[in-house]
Amino acid sequence: MRTEPDRKSSYGRSMTQTQQAQKILVTGATGTVGRQVVAELLARGHTVRALTRDPATADFPAGVEVVRGDLTDPDSLVPALVGVTGVHLITFGGAYFAPLETGPRILELARAAGVRRVTVLHGGEATPLEQAVRADGRVDWTVIMPVEFMGNALEWADGIVTAGEVREPFVSRLSAMVHEGDIGAVAAVALTEEGHGSQEYVITGPELLTVGDKVATIAAARGRDIALVELTEEEAVAQWRAAGHPEDVIGFLLEAYGNTPEVGRTVADTVEKVTGRPARTFGQWAAEHADTFRAG
């Protein structure tokens, strides 16, 4: 069952008001969420060590210590774990992003290195690594469970720029989509502050939006109208196949969009409770990315 803090406590205060700087290891650091965790930790004054299989292409801001490692080979993490107090984990790894079976060994190494806190980015199902973390009683763990990313709207950019339109099925579906930066902010607090052990945080934005709402918001941000073309399921499947999506992904999209689970269309106040500030709106996200939706 999801649990949440029942008071704001010191959540959301700057690091200098509440604690000393800490060193945090971020795995999956080059991913969409990983980069936001890195950015938020830096903004709060902490030291970040970013794990990647290819440091040469990581492209992190100055001040981030980039180290080589692979979650499918836990012993490769030993140097990266030295001196860190917290670790952000993902549940998939390797070249084909298979569910990680290495959770118990990763946790064993983390405990031996003195790690006190672990966050896990939920992978959409009960993965072996997440199960191993939940079963561990010797570190403070927090499971981070975001709903649909606002960044998914970037998939519309080509159609908007070239044809001034968005072509989607299920246009009346509701989503409590979340700004990726807010995912990073919640993870950063859980990794560096007390009071988040054994917690499962569902992270959403502050509003429910239809596809039409999102399109109108992007249109306002870019300063030009966008047509919304509703597709049938058959037309949507054909479009996704033409885009190269495999059949299992198409099946997932049909289920997620055609029968959005309640958790994905219910606003939660987790961001404000944990960070002390409101969750960012889709309007804010659209303003940040307005140029992406403009021609030229």
Task: Describe each region flagged by the PLM.
Residues R2, S10, T16-A62, T72-V84, ...:
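Oxidoreductase cofactor-interface core, primarily capturing Rossmann-like NAD(P)-dependent enzymes
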Residues E4-G12, E233-G296:
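A hydrophobic C-terminal alpha-helical subdomain
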